[in-house]
Design a protein with these regions (language model features):
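N-terminal alpha-helical interaction modules that lie
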Residues: 1-184, 192-206, 273-309
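TPR/Sel1-like alpha-solenoid repeat signature
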Residues: 167-170, 198, 213-216, 246, ...
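Extracellular loop and loop/strand-boundary signature of outer-membrane beta-barrel proteins
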Residues: 184-187, 235
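Short acidic-hydrophobic sequence patches enriched in Asp/Glu that either
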Residues: 191-194, 235-242, 279
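Alpha-helical adaptor scaffolds
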Residues: 205-255
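Amphipathic alpha-helical protein-interaction segments enriched in hydrophobic
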Residues: 211-216, 258-269, 299, 303
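Glycine/small-residue-rich hydrophobic helix-like segments
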Residues: 245, 254-284
Length: 309
């Protein structure tokens, strides 16, 4: 994943099933594990994507792909518009990328997002990060995918400093990468402060960004879990009350989200331990009872169900 595009080749790759023109990364994505709960159940074809968009994107407040929303994004971030093909080309690619993402076809979502150019990097990066965190079983491949996403997002926020979801996916990728190289190692390398700073930028641009609040809640909880309550507060500014504050904010913004609830339950255990075991189990129960709207929500419902058995 990178920010130098051959538009024609990228567009052809998004419509083809293979061939020698595929990049090494695209070829590796063909071996990605499939979403384990069916590839059609969360496929929002035709107008279904638009009619369900508000529910699907309540957590990140991303605008539905259209000529108007694309124009507003580029007005706010002019560097995104350099050499951009017309909306008649880009908008369908973005719609299809998001369809693939919500359906759990994460490799296709990456390919189609990349084909749309820098404006497609949010969906591409999010698809790759979700795949790596939830489905990739090989540790070295998981770290490699997340490292690529971090590098892409670091470049994206330079092009689009006023795009809340560019900052959000950057924070998501940094957080997942930190988890997989070990939180302690990540803190030593300065990633902890960067995760917090990046997610705070997302919230500053979009105060109703529930997913960014989740990311910040996870950050505080994981630092506390790894270095202890006192060291976390003194050295990294991580606090138990911030865990609760961020997750309660996320739950108020996106009630009945299994993503919010499952991460809330896990973070409660990390930050508070056995003293809040009952609360964590109750929140896992809430997550398990949710009706998932897309592949990521289904993965988190299944996770919660496993915790309640």
């Amino acid at each position: 994943m990178h920010l130098t595009f051959d538009w024609g080749a990228a567009f052809r790759r998004s419509r083809q099933s293979g061939g020698p023109a595929e990049s090494d990364q695209a070829n590796r994505r063909r071996s990605w594990k499939r979403f384990p709960y069916g590839d059609r159940i969360y496929r929002y074809g035709g107008t279904a994507l638009k009619s369900n968009w508000a529910r699907l994107h309540r957590g990140d407040r991303e605008a539905y792909p259209s000529a108007e929303s694309l124009g507003a994004l580029i007005d706010a971030n002019p560097a995104l518009g350099a050499s951009l093909p017309p909306p008649t080309v880009v908008v369908p690619l973005l719609e299809d990328a998001w369809r693939a993402y919500h359906a759990g076809d994460f490799a296709d979502a990456v390919d189609r997002g990349l084909a749309a150019g820098p404006v497609g990097l949010v969906v591409s990066a999010r698809a790759a990060a979700v795949y790596a965190a939830h489905l990739e079983e090989d540790e070295s491949r998981r770290v490699e995918i997340l490292r690529d996403v971090v590098e892409s997002c670091a470049s994206l926020v330079k092009l689009a400093p006023k795009w809340a979801n560019a900052w959000y996916v950057y924070g998501l990728a940094l957080g997942r990468y930190s988890q997989n190289i070990s939180v302690v190692r990540a803190l030593a390398q300065g990633f902890g402060g960067r995760v917090r700073e990046v997610l705070q930028r997302a919230i500053a641009l979009e105060p109703a960004h529930a997913d960014a609040h989740v990311g910040l809640g996870v950050y505080h909880a994981e630092v506390i879990d790894k270095v202890g309550v006192m060291m976390a507060a003194l050295t990294y500014g991580a606090r138990r009350d911030a865990v609760t504050e961020h997750f309660e904010a996320a739950r108020a913004l996106h009630p009945q989200s299994p993503v919010v609830l499952a991460e809330y339950a896990r973070s409660t255990l990390l930050a508070f331990g056995v003293s809040e075991l009952g609360k964590a189990h109750r929140i896992f129960d809430e997550a398990a009872a949710c009706q998932p709207a897309d592949a990521l929500e289904r993965l988190d419902v299944e996770w919660a169900l496993g915790e309640t058995e």
